[in-house]
Amino acid sequence: MFRVLNKVFDTNQRDVQRIVKTVVQPVNALEEETMKIENLAEAFMRLRQRVQEGGESLDDVLVPAFALIREAGRRAIGKRHYDVQLIGGTALHQGRIAEMRTGEGKTLVATLALALNALEGKGAHLVTVNDYLARVGAEEMGLLYRTLGLSVGLITRDMQPHQRQAAYACDITYVTNSELGFDYLRDNMAQSREQLVLRADNPLHYAIVDEVDSILIDEARTPLIISGAAEKATDLYYVYAKLVKRLQRGEPAEPGKRTEPTGDYTIDEKGKQVHLTEQGIAKIERLLSLGDLYSPENMDKAHMITQAIRARELYHREKDYIVNAEGEVVIIDEFTGRSMPGRRYGEGLHQAIEAKEGVKIENENQTLATITYQNFFRLYDKFAGMTGTAKTEEKEFLDIYGSDVLVIPTNKPVIRQDADDLVYRTRMGKYQAVVEEVKQMHATGRPILIGTASIDTSEQLSALLKQAGIRHSVLNAKYEAQEASIIAQAGRSGTVTIATNMAGRGTDIMLGGNAEFILGEAIEQNFGISRFTPEAEAFIKAIGREDPEAVTLGLRIPGMTEQFIRQAQQLQKDIIADRERVRELGGLHIIGTERHESRRIDNQLRGRAGRQGDPGSSRFYVSFEDDLMRLFASDRVVAMMDRLGMDDTQPIEAKMVTGAIERAQARVEDRNFGIRKQLLEFDNVMSKQRDIIYAQRREVLLGTDEDVEESTEGMIADFTEMQLAFYAPIDQPAESWDLETLRTNMLEAVPQLEHYDFEALRHMAPEAAHAHLLEAVADAFDARKAELGPTMLNSLARYVLLQVVDQHWKEHLHGMDVLRQGIGLRGYGQRDPFTEYKFEATNMFNDMIDNLKADVTKFIFRMQFGQAS
């Protein structure tokens, strides 16, 4: 085992040394020369020209680019990138996951890879977990980017579409994972190019995901969903169920008997389809006072009426479905005869059957668009990630995202002391021990951070600390900006802070407090300007250096007084003094109140202490009533406590126990990874389908008129070939062809074929017959184009394609949801649920595409002039 571990560390070390040799040393060699460059923006733009016009790769210009970015950091924000930060920036550029300890300056490291990748002119995204961190990153690093001539955008929750367009058009954009994901989904529901907010040409080029383990592992299974209320149409299903009772079933046209179909609709039992006749269309329009049934505003109504007829004529109670005691329509498996609870017909058919039966129609939000973070970030041309804890999850990053983890060396050695766990019999015994430890530490003035796994635990501990008379702050990840403010000061002497695991993530805890943070907040509150303006930044930096020029710089800020400046100078002195005091006391002490299922989360909590070479310590308190211990701890440990006669207040402290806990965590991590990987396999089926639909939409939205016309003609030809394959198959004798149904179906879609002699097809060679009908349909399309004019036809085609694709995709998503939920209930015996899901999902998708092409054909040939406007 140790040999394997050594091999892992050797590989990491070799990679680091390679970057030192090929990047760090050459960048350092350029430093003196770069400091002499007066206009960094001009120099950086010359690199942009080399990449965009000269054909050089980003790797070709990496060294001079990093040298310029480092110098921009020094000049603009007073922060020069350390050598280890250059290593981190290189890893991010390479599309790797960079593991960097807390306090190592991830925000600054990201500027290297973001600015470098922005040279391609395709945009670079910094993705973080909340609006507050996105704003701080964009504003704090904005000066650096602007010094290089790069534009910086920020996306926040409350922005309007035009503001989002401007932000995404910038060279570098800071955005939260949820806003980015939802913008992507909304763009794929847009009805015109002008509605797109992401770049039209290459929306997802390069991204760095901050706190990458949180987004791509902890939130990996949480899908982003845009939904709309489906209940609006519920009453209409009942209306149409009554309407179709007033329609008459007819017979299709039949040579020698009828030249036209009779009745209001005809039935195709073989294909389980219904077809409205001209008489039926006119009757529906009259009964509903609709005008044209095939006008844009009536598209959904035409679809729902067709489904109501199918429900009435083709789906029968006790054969295709039952109505159970709860009044639910439950499908019967046609092969086994068993009911399939949880399964629903797609595309509105199930609701139509519910309306026919007079039972309650299921009210639910209709999914309009959805994607998981796992599949979303894999759409990027290249993405990287950074976090304090990633190595324990490297297998998952590699298997799912193809990204390895590079552990970046710390700038200064880590000297934090991590004690073995203390294990108690009961949870309350553990909490009492935590309070005693806090009392003792607090008496010395040492700052303490208590990490909890839940809000409930933090409130319990808070109540116990109040009883003990210990003042403290409680954080539970509800208020992002206030949270950062409190966590930034958690390193001051005498401070006790309770925080849930994720609270304040992304904000450093500095011993003695964070003077820059306090001063920045005071400037914003007192003078109404951002702490990131050049004037405020210069003043804050001068205070931090204890520079006498701080007085002159401060008085340049409108409204600032000498009294405020003196208070700022005193604050800096107090914090420096307090920092030394806290260091002498041993630094920040971390108390973990239980072990998390993931070692990574525990390591994140520990990593709060010991930043940048500071002293610090950590210890976890565990009880046998904790979930992890209850489910996974060895019975031997419990038995040992019993043998020793230990009571609730006596702990075990032994490496054996700590090791047992970590082995339990590794087992849980493996299990959770397996679950995520299995779910991803299911998601990948949907992902491939989504890629096809979104590519089709994008082609319609952004393509030329010629592209759209070609797509439309292709769909019409596909629909025609589909009908021919079904009713006049080449491999069957012509005498057996069902030309009557072929005629009915084709006339419903292409009424311009009313004079076409379908019976004549029987007397041609099969291939010639197919070609003849296809040519007739192509002629009908040309006639339609001549009738409407090319411009009007293309407007109509774009509109119809988008509307039809969106309607069918929305209904398909619902069907996929139902399939996913019901797949485990299907009694497949020894058959693999995933194989069955993939098979059924593929069939559903193919059916949807066929129906989509049929609807496009129908609307293109039937819609009246002016209705698409």
UniProtKB/Swiss-Prot annotation:
EC number per UniProt: 7.4.2.8
Bilayer topology: Peripheral membrane protein
EC primary class: translocase
Residues that, per the record, bind ATP: Q85, G103, E104, G105, K106, T107, D508
Major place of residence: membrane
Gene Ontology terms: cellular component: cell envelope Sec protein transport complex; cytosol; plasma membrane
Keyword annotations: ATP-binding, Cell membrane, Cytoplasm, Membrane, Nucleotide-binding, Protein transport, Translocase, Translocation, Transport
Reactions this protein catalyses: ATP + H2O + cellular proteinSide 1 = ADP + phosphate + cellular proteinSide 2
GO biological process terms held by the UniProt record: intracellular protein transmembrane transport; protein import; protein targeting; protein transport by the Sec complex
Subcellular location(s) per record: Cell membrane; Cytoplasm
Superkingdom, natural source: Bacteria
Classification via SMART domains: SecA_DEAD, SecA_PP_bind
Entry GO MF terms: ATP binding; protein-exporting ATPase activity
Pfam families, A to Z: P-loop_SecA, SecA_DEAD, SecA_PP_bind, SecA_SW
Family: Belongs to the SecA family.
Annotated function: Part of the Sec protein translocase complex. Interacts with the SecYEG preprotein conducting channel. Has a central role in coupling the hydrolysis of ATP to the transfer of proteins into and across the cell membrane, serving as an ATP-driven molecular motor driving the stepwise translocation of polypeptide chains across the membrane.
PANTHER family: CHLOROPLAST PROTEIN-TRANSPORTING ATPASE, SECA INNER MEMBRANE COMPONENT OF SEC PROTEIN SECRETION SYSTEM
Subunit structure: Monomer and homodimer. Part of the essential Sec protein translocation apparatus which comprises SecA, SecYEG and auxiliary proteins SecDF. Other proteins may also be involved.
The name this protein goes by in its record: Protein translocase subunit SecA
Gene that encodes the chain: secA
